Regions:
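A short, small-residue-rich loop immediately preceding and capping a beta-strand
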Residues: 22-25, 46-48, 66-105, 276-284, ...
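Glycine-rich, anion-gripping cofactor-binding loops and their flanking helix/strand elements
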Residues: 83, 220-305, 408-438, 453-454
Length: 506
């Protein structure tokens, strides 16, 4: 098999394959030519060429999100790797595995006036789970076995119980384009520790006692579809003292759950003790609703258990008691194996009654519209969308409007809620559509978000299963509905940032 003449590059490619990474998004360049050649020549690797590095980063993110596996990114030296940073930070806060391969000059040439050269070492240090620096000038100073183990450790980190992005920066000398017949397999896999699936029973006994004696609120953030967790939560939601709140991006649906948090909290009396939980259980990633976050921070919650391996010290509600590094399905399955007692507190019933009233009021509210509004447009789109598709929601107003409507049965909801930026919504949705042609993928985007990421449309071949709906309101409509900017005289120019460009012209 033909490959790059550089042993270091061959070793890296073999290690990627050993850890199941077979898809690579390549951004064209010269310094990363040895990788481009090695990837292209390898029969087990599929490459996707994306010119704009910022778009490339989010396309890789969408692929990893859709497949549930690590995707590699590869770019040339200089500012190219900086353009990956928005996607890297999104992957970090979403716990999505990416392996960023940035080609570089050898360290001896950094900050000495050579072209297309910046300090790339540790460039992502605040938003990655691990990094490794390899330099062709220094490669022979360690054994092949040492390099194999270092790479294996890095790739394990990306795909551990707490997943996320890692960075491999590789200093390469010229010549860059030479090839050889590859004869050695450099792959080496290290043994992995299996994550725990259960709490020790004494710890679980304490939690069960608290469940039996308290008003319990379970809040689900952004998650992949999880039928097992949904089943276990359905069982818990049958108890009168347990309430389950979900958002569309939680991707679990059942009539026992409260799906539209902001709709339910509209007009909610936050001082009413009957609605305040004593025990808070959270799972998943980001929660869209600012109202529920503000409410829970001031609700006097006695204990908060955070379920999952990711970000164990993240104290969103300022009442964190303990992070439990189990998967949600394993944790709730163990809860249900124990004897829960249905206490007499009608906590669930009160919340559900509030939800039903809010839903009826919402119908009345929408029926009174006499002119076209963003909400009406969104409701019309919701009514027309078929089941069994992947619905991608761009950030700002779109993802918030979606939370005001009941989820469409069978639809999976996706959104870049790690950093909640508008910069990569189209590219992320496109990446998901590219690797899963069996599903229809629809993105709903505002005009500003769409224009910001319009280089995604440069990708070819463009997937036929990807549809894009742009809500054209000539600016950042979110600033008309959030407190503060709506009352500011600077709103139109500096916040809403009115613009006249039509997405149809792109």
């Amino acid at each position: 098999m033909i490959s790059s003449s550089k042993i270091m590059v061959q070793l890296i490619v073999d290690q990627l394959l050993a850890y199941g990474i077979r898809k690579v998004v390549v951004s064209p360049g010269s310094r990363n030519a040895p990788f481009s050649i090695a990837f292209d020549e390898h029969p087990e690797i599929e490459t996707f060429v994306v010119h704009d590095e910022r778009s490339a980063g989010f396309i890789a993110l969408g692929m990893a999100q859709e497949l549930g596996e690590a995707i590699a990114l590869c770019c040339t030296s200089g500012s190219a790797c900086l353009n990956y940073y928005p996607a890297v930070s999104e992957a970090f806060y979403r716990s999505i595995p990416l392996v960023v391969l940035s080609a570089d000059r050898p360290a001896s040439w950094i900050n000495h006036g050579d072209g297309q050269t910046i300090v790339q070492k540790d460039v992502y240090k605040n938003h990655i789970l691990g990094s490794l620096e390899l330099d062709e000038d220094l490669f022979a100073q360690k054994s092949i076995e040492s390099h194999q183990e270092e790479l294996a450790s890095l790739l394990q980190i990306a795909q551990s119980n707490w997943k996320g992005p890692v960075h491999l920066n590789v200093g390469l000398n010229e010549p860059l384009y030479q090839t050889v017949e590859k004869t050695i397999d450099y792959a080496k896999v290290l043994p992995r520790e299996k994550p725990s699936k259960r709490l020790i029973q004494t710890e679980m006994d304490v939690i069960i006692q608290e469940f039996n004696q308290s008003k319990v609120l379970i809040l689900c953030g952004q998650m992949d579809a999880n039928p097992k967790a949904q089943l276990e939560l359905m069982k818990l939601a049958a108890f009168p003292n347990i309430v389950v709140l979900v958002e569309n991006t939680s991707n679990i649906q059942h009539e026992r759950f409260i799906h539209c948090i902001d709709r339910t909290l509209n007009g909610f009396d936050q001082t009413n003790e009957a609605f305040k939980p004593e025990i808070l259980i959270t799972l998943g990633g980001a929660v869209v609703s600012k109202r529920i976050k503000a409410y829970l921070r001031n609700a006097g919650v006695k204990k908060h258990y955070k379920i999952g391996a990711e970000f164990p010290e993240m104290d969103t509600y300022r009442c964190l008691t303990k992070a439990i590094p189990l998967s949600p399905s394993d944790f709730f399955e163990q809860i249900n194996e124990n004897e829960l007692i249905a206490n007499t507190v009608n906590f669930n019933g009160k919340w559900k009654a509030l939800d039903i009233i809010a839903k009826d009021r919402s119908r009345e509210f929408h029926s009174e519209f006499t002119s076209l509004t963003d909400l009406q447009v969104f409701q019309t789109i919701q009514d027309l969308l078929p089941e069994d598709l992947v619905l991608h929601l761009a950030n700002s107003s779109v993802v918030r409007y979606a939370q005001l409507f009941d989820p469409i049965p069978g639809v999976r909801y996706e959104s870049n809620r790690g950093t909640s930026g508008i910069d990569g919504s189209t590219s992320t949705a496109l990446g998901a559509a590219i690797v899963n042609s069996r599903k229809q993928h629809v993105l709903i985007s505002g005009d500003i978000s769409f224009l910001y990421d319009s280089n995604a449309l440069w990708y070819a071949p463009f997937p036929r299963n990807f549809k894009l709906i742009v809500i054209q309101n000539y600016g950042g409509g979110i600033f008309n509905i959030i407190t503060g900017p709506a009352e500011s005289k600077q709103r139109e120019r500096y916040f809403e940032a009115k613009q006249a460009k039509s997405p149809a012209s792109i």
